[in-house]
A protein has these predicted regions:
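Non-heme di-metal
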Residues: 1-146
Length: 146
């Protein structure tokens, strides 16, 4: 059975570091990837050389995959914190998850704007995949049962 924390005399620990981060996130986390105009980026992409495009695409694919991985893998941490009743940390981590989701949207929007729809996982190194596709999810999933 869940026990409500904020409805008790304890309330919220408004002076705690996680709660202050939560307040800061509400103030400064107001950007929207869908509102960014990538028209000039698309033109610059077309003007870039093949070598430049390959380098940029490799970087974009790493950012895209990394942001998506963090978006997916933060939930077990939030669940573990919630089970411990650390509401202020949970509140902050939900804003962190929201920002990671926006990063995922941002990089996908960039890729769409420049017309890149191909299989980007092919550009990721084996060591990158090991960290973000194997180690990170396995480690974070342990938080659910540990």
């Amino acid at each position: 059975m869940r026990k409500t924390i904020t409805a008790t005399p304890r309330g919220l620990m408004v002076d705690s570091f996680p709660y202050r981060l939560y307040q800061k996130a509400k103030k400064v986390g107001t950007w929207n990837p869908a509102e960014i105009d990538f028209t000039q980026d698309a033109k610059d992409w077309q003007a870039a050389t093949d070598t430049q495009r390959q380098s940029i695409l490799r970087l974009l694919s790493q950012f895209q995959a990394g942001e998506e991985a963090v978006t997916l893998d933060l939930l077990p941490l939030i669940m573990a914190i919630a089970k411990e009743g650390r509401i202020e940390e949970e509140m902050f981590l939900t804003t962190f998850l929201f920002e990671e989701a926006k990063h995922t949207e941002f990089f996908r929007t960039v890729l769409d704007a420049i017309g890149e729809k191909g299989e980007l996982n092919l550009l990721l190194s084996d060591s990158y995949k090991q960290v973000f596709h194997v180690i990170l999810p396995e480690t974070m999933d342990r938080l659910i049962t540990d």
